[in-house]
Structure formats: C-alpha cells, structure tokens
Amino acid sequence: MASQLTDAFARKYYYLRLSITDVCNFRCTYCLPDGYKPSGVTNKGFLTVDEIRRVTRAFASLGTEKVRLTGGEPSLRRDFTDIIAAVRENDAIRQIAVTTNGYRLERDVANWRDAGLTGINVSVDSLDARQFHAITGQDKFNQVMAGIDAAFEAGFEKVKVNTVLMRDVNHHQLDTFLNWIQHRPIQLRFIELMETGEGSELFRKHHISGQVLRDELLRRGWIHQLRQRSDGPAQVFCHPDYAGEIGLIMPYEKDFCATCNRLRVSSIGKLHLCLFGEGGVNLRDLLEDDTQQQALEARISAALREKKQTHFLHQNNTGITQNLSYIGG
C-alpha cells in the first residue's frame, strides 16, 4: 500500500514507533541514570490494548507497514503479548518489532513470536559483564545474552542489537563486537550518543561521531547496503566473512533527516513528529471508540503537515526530550 502520510517535503511515512510505557527497570547512564521516576502517569494512565488497537488500525489504514513497540521497557507490561496480538490484527502491518533491554527475553520470547512479533532489538552497550553492569545499573549481562540465544531458538532469523557509542566507554571495542557477530546473524547497530535535556554533561564528555567507525569499516572491506522504505535510520554494512551486519545511526550527520520515514506516538497517546520536536498532538480523545477512526486519521494527516524539515540538534535544541524513556528513542 502506498503511504497516504506524506509531509511538505515529500517524505513518506511507513513506520510507527509506539511507546507503551515509560517505565524501565534499568538505569542506563545515557537514558535514566537516576532510575525511573514517575512523571505523574500511573500504569493505568498508559494506552490500553483497545487504544493501541485503534491507533495502529488508523496508521495501518494510512499506509503504515511497520510498528515498533518501545518504552521504557515494553515487556514490563503484563499485557505485552496481548498488545502484540492487537497490532497483528492489521494485515497491512507487515513488521511488528520491539526494542527491549532483554531481561525477559529468555522467558517470554517464544510467546511473543507466537503472538505475531517479527523483529527484536536488544540494547547491549558492552560485551564485558562488569562494564554492562556499570552502564545499566543491573547485573543482567548473562541473562540478556541467554535471551538473545532464546530468540534464535524461537525462530527469529536475525536479532538486532543496539549499542550506544560512547567515547572512552566502548568506542574502542570494535574488534570485540565484530568477533561476536562473525558467526551470528546479528545486526549490531552503533548509535551516536544524542544530547537530551537531562544529558548535556554526559554528551559533552562521551559523544563521538559514528563516522570514525564508518571509515574503519570501509577500510576493512565492509560494504554499504541500500535502505528499504520501511527501514529505520541505520546505514547498514555487510562483509562476506561475517554472518552479522553493522548498522550506524548518526543523527548529527548532514541530511540525516532527509530520509525520515517514521512517526512516534507516546505511551499517553501523543503524536510526536520528531524525537527532538516540541510538544505533541493529542490523539487520545479519538481513541475512545471505533467510530472515531476517520477523525483520528484526519488529525494524524493534518499534524504531519507541520513536521519540520530537520531537527535542531546541531543548535543544542533537544526539544521536549528530557530523557529517551519518555518517547521511546
């Protein structure tokens, strides 16, 4: 289906990132260094399964092909499997993925797959157990690794692993990561550290451009792959000697926003046109009843006309994003 979601700059939107909670049990230094602190929203305040069903139905009708469930940590919701199944009801949505810290993968991943999940991203910022503990605040490295193995055993042909690239923390560990994916079908995605409202000091201390890694990969014979229309923002590289792939997400690179194809809905039902945009468009009053779908689609389409051509990270403008758990990264 051709996307009906097209902005003023002729960008088409096939990809919805849907946050279902902002609660997380990890304390990652770049996201929630002081742990989760409720912002006045209780668990009962997050989108219900029926509301999720309605919002994804509207996006599917407008041409969305891929939905990624994010948080916080999505698997903390007891109804997470039901949420996957609700999204799966839309035939137009070909891919349903989750971004997770992985701590419940080993126990639940087979059930998620049975419910309709087609893709998994796991956050792993270090392959050293002690450093993993230091970054996340949780001594769960072996549990997360077992979860990745369980995902393959459950039938997932590929697992994506997200690694936030940080100077003097993990930027020098490329060889360790490459050895890990040599015989595993893992797409390892290095994500440039992004400045948020609460993370300016960390950003100044640890930001390093992904271009350093890209130059090194090209020097070693890695080959840049073409993007598909519902892919995320990663530049993906492959190598004939490796079962895995490398992805680079570099939001500070020139023209990063030119290929934007994704919209975001927060866990309380606000449409965000950009991860680092201002404010959000409330959709929740149109998620109460199935009869509101036409009005919901109209509001989404109208909001998209206001999407700006680019973010303003280069000007140190992080918008309303105080931390990445709020809107799901």
From Swiss-Prot:
Listed SMART domains: Elp3
Catalytic activity: GTP + AH2 + S-adenosyl-L-methionine = (8S)-3',8-cyclo-7,8-dihydroguanosine 5'-triphosphate + 5'-deoxyadenosine + L-methionine + A + H(+)
Similarity remark: Belongs to the radical SAM superfamily. MoaA family.
EC numbers on record: 4.1.99.22
Disulfide topology: none
Reported cofactor(s): [4Fe-4S] cluster
Record: residues binding S-adenosyl-L-methionine: 30, 72, 123, 194
Residue stretches making up the Radical SAM core domain: 8-234
Name of the coding gene: moaA
Record function comment: Catalyzes the cyclization of GTP to (8S)-3',8-cyclo-7,8-dihydroguanosine 5'-triphosphate.
Protein's pathway: Cofactor biosynthesis; molybdopterin biosynthesis
Record's protein name: GTP 3',8-cyclase
Amino acids binding GTP: 17, 68, 99, 160, 262-264
Binding site for [4Fe-4S] cluster 2: 257, 260, 274
GO annotation, biological process: Mo-molybdopterin cofactor biosynthetic process
Entry-linked HAMAP family: MoaA_B
Alphabetized CDD domains for the sequence: Radical_SAM, Twitch_MoaA
Subunit structure, as described in the record: Monomer and homodimer.
Signal peptide location: none
Cofactor binding comment, as recorded: Binds 2 [4Fe-4S] clusters. Binds 1 [4Fe-4S] cluster coordinated with 3 cysteines and an exchangeable S-adenosyl-L-methionine and 1 [4Fe-4S] cluster coordinated with 3 cysteines and the GTP-derived substrate.
PANTHER family per the UniProt record, alphabetical: GTP 3',8-CYCLASE, MOLYBDOPTERIN COFACTOR SYNTHESIS PROTEIN A
Binding residues for [4Fe-4S] cluster 1: 24, 28, 31
GO MF entries: 4 iron, 4 sulfur cluster binding; cyclic pyranopterin monophosphate synthase activity; GTP 3',8'-cyclase activity; GTP binding; metal ion binding; S-adenosyl-L-methionine binding
Top enzyme category: lyase
Keywords of this entry: 4Fe-4S, GTP-binding, Iron, Iron-sulfur, Lyase, Metal-binding, Molybdenum cofactor biosynthesis, Nucleotide-binding, S-adenosyl-L-methionine
